[in-house]
Structures are given as C-alpha cells and as structure tokens.
Amino acid sequence: MDCWNLLSKVLPVTPRVLLYGPPGTGKTYFANTEGLKENQQIYQTTLTQDSTAAELLGHYVPNESGAFDWLDGIGIKAWKEGARLVINEIDNAGVDVMTFLHALLDDPKFAKFTLPNKEKETVRPATGFQIVATMNGVPDDLPEALADRFPVKLHMDTVNPSAIQELPANLQGV
C-alpha cells in the first residue's frame, strides 16, 4: 500500500499524525483536504523560529473602550471546536512554541490547559480535535518528548496524486 492510501485510512481515525518527507510532495495539501469529518473546521499555521506560543495559545488585544480582551489563538480555537489543526514545518518551532505544543499534543482523553486569561478558563479538546503536523526532515529532528506525542508518523515519499490533479494540465507529468 502506498503512503497516500495508508494516510487516507489512518487520518480519519487518528487524533495526532506527523507527516514527513521531501518538500513539494503534497503533505499540507492532503492535510487540508482529506479525511475531514463532516463540517470539520481547519486551522493552519506554518512555524518558524520567530513564531510565538501566543499565535497558538492566544493573547490580549485592545478593544474599542481601551480595555483588553482575550483572543484565543488557533490552537485553542481548534481545541474548543473539535477542529483539525494543521501545523506546517513543526521542526522549525522555537522553544516558546515547543513548550505549548506539548500541551496541545497530549492525549485528548487527558489533555487540559488553563488559559492565562482573566477567567483562568480551563479548556479541553472537544470531540474530533485533531493535529496533523508536517515537516521536511525526519522525526528524529524533533525533541523526543514531542515526537513521542504522535502515535502515527508517516513518511510521504511520493507526490500526492490528488495534488497533481489540481495542477494545470500543462504541468501534470512534468
């Protein structure tokens, strides 16, 4: 069975999946288009060394009255909604983001996080929450504690056939 057929079987039933392999194979495309539950929302981010945990967790923003309101980051939004969170280039995350990823990637049965908002709201992942992370390196490039949080790690070593079909006809087969 090729890697894409295997992924199509695993993705709908696995809460945490790591896709790794060469750039341009369609890992992100697949994560955003396949194996979604009906009406499942998708949130996506691409991590860099400059990414902050606040992008995933949330932060305070000024409102019209000059006070500050808490704004959930995409990781917390995905948790609350039971959405799919696609994290591209997870291996590029800095220490700040890595620390928060440990909480996001905990087993959904046990995961919980207390937000640093005024209410000190404790959140848990809603039913259906899923993380699909991608990277161009290999799982050994990740800290062991982070890599171990992915029960499924798939090497995507061929180009995604569905992604090829989306290309203009003159580029297919190039």
Which functions belong to the PLM regions below?
Residues 1-174:
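AAA+ P-loop NTPase catalytic core and its hallmark functional loops
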